[in-house]
Amino acid sequence: MSIFETPRLILRPWKEKDEDAEALYKYAKDPAVGPIAGWPPHTSVGHSREVIRALLTYPEVYAVVLKETGEPVGNISLMFSNTAHTADIADNEAEMGYWIGVPYWGQGLIPEAVRRLLQHCFEDLDLQAVWCGYYDGNVRSKRVQEKCGFRFNHTEAGKRSPLGDIRTEHFMKLLRTEWMKDAQ
């Protein structure tokens, strides 16, 4: 699996070791982080370790690591038509998901990570489009997508989230041709 760098971040695979599990728990236990994205807060370091083992070791799943400290403070990932995803995507498309710990909200770190992963999507993976979704009320996620060039595609009401509740999800999409034009 690849490792990517930005001016302030390293995007690298999660490791099944105590340091990564502890860092994941530190930020994923906060009820302001997971539920708005559709997943429950983590309940222990052991729970976070199991999440790493079961979900975060897939290809194209990256810890968002601060270069300055070496600490994972969030996650960014790509999901394809043959893996879990919520958008109706074609074989040459992916869905991107991300989150970052509350202390790092508003610092532009996730847009920095998204832009780097988009470069990977279009230059290395030769994808034709990348999707992102956000639930009603998740204005921070919507703003990240807008800042990174995604455009509104459609809304799906009455969707069951991974938490089991019914929500409205909005989908945005960035085409390779749009990204290439904006990258010039």
Regions found by a protein language model. Give the residues of each.
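Short loop/turn motifs at secondary-structure junctions and domain boundaries
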Residues: 53-58, 150
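Acyl-donor (CoA/ACP) binding surface of acyl/acetyltransferases
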Residues: 1-32, 61-184
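Conserved GNAT-fold acetyl-CoA-binding loop/helix
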Residues: 32-52
